[in-house]
From Swiss-Prot:
Its EC number is 2.7.4.6. This is Nucleoside diphosphate kinase. Major role in the synthesis of nucleoside triphosphates other than ATP. The ATP gamma phosphate is transferred to the NDP beta phosphate via a ping-pong mechanism, using a phosphorylated active-site intermediate. It comes from Staphylococcus carnosus (strain TM300). GO terms for biological process: CTP biosynthetic process; GTP biosynthetic process; UTP biosynthetic process. It is found in: Cytoplasm. GO terms for cellular component: cytoplasm. One of its GO terms (molecular function) is metal ion binding. Its main location: cytoplasm. SUPFAM superfamilies: Nucleoside diphosphate kinase, NDK.
Amino acid sequence: MERTFLMIKPDGVQRKLVGEIITRLEKKGLKLVGGKFMTVSKEKAETHYGEHADKPFYEGLVSFITSAPVFAMVVEGENVVEVTRNMIGKTNPTEAAPGTIRGDLGLTVGRNVIHGSDSVESAKREISLWFEPNELSVYTANDEEWLYEN
């Protein structure tokens, strides 16, 4: 089963949206296999957003993500990267479709509530950056037989 990394950003935590976002993911049939509140170190933020280091918004992004706690999580499901990207919506909440997390809850590009891995490769890299293997659970949910075709 595929896994992806999601992070509810400081704006989402401060606005008390963690429960709503997890509920949306679980209603979609996705399984939470790891999660933790944490204050992000500057080093971890710089590593996570390293691909943007040469962009003008990089310093502000690092500063924002380290400014208050985030909720980092790993979610599992069939085609979970694609499914969660569709659920999250476009980066700019004003362009995100109604019904998506950013379309419904995001305010601006800089306060768009959530990060999600954009590929299976990114998900693997980000999961290993944010979680130790022993922090992730392996279990069969009671409803899995109803969610996936064999």
